[in-house]
Amino acid sequence: MGLDASVADKRSIWPWLAIVLTLVAVTFQLYYQGRLWLCSCGQFFLWVGEARSSNTSQHLLDPYSFTHVLHGFVFCWLLGWFAPRLSWTWRLWLAITAEAVWEVIENSNFVIQRYREAGALGYFGDTIVNSLGDIAMCGFGFVLARYLGFVRSLALFVALEVVLLFWIRDSLVLNVVTLIYPIEWIEQWQAGY
């Protein structure tokens, strides 16, 4: 291994260190915002399969984790188009940073109240563990979209949206729409009426 390879190897560690620092920073910020580390129920689950339960957003993964995979897809596409000269690892860091910023915003009192007004009456915000799980799923989605390429990841995006609509009566697109502009018939459909 020559000097050039050694320098390149050392440079390639910086995006990974940046990711770790981002995760540490978002953890401290969420803690500062009053988020609990774990569910107040005193239990810890890797997976909660119910979309509308008191355990949703309180454990590592839940059905909404799939929407965070889709965040990763979208970030991969956008950063690939707008920052093609950046290495994929730096684009991954940008995606994880954007997702971390979203987790901080999503767990602000304003957005929690907005979700509650849009029909998520029992929603009190994510635990720190759930937010970190969401960020990890976004990173997974980014890497998966990079591996699959645009066309196949777009097909998977659409398929996941459809599956989520039938499974939990929600999806990334629907979540964004109802957060910005709640529509009564969508809220009624989501509630099962």
Feature map (PLM): residue ranges:
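Bulky hydrophobic segments
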Residues: 2-123, 139-193
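Individual transmembrane alpha-helices with interfacial aromatic-anchor signatures
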Residues: 125-132
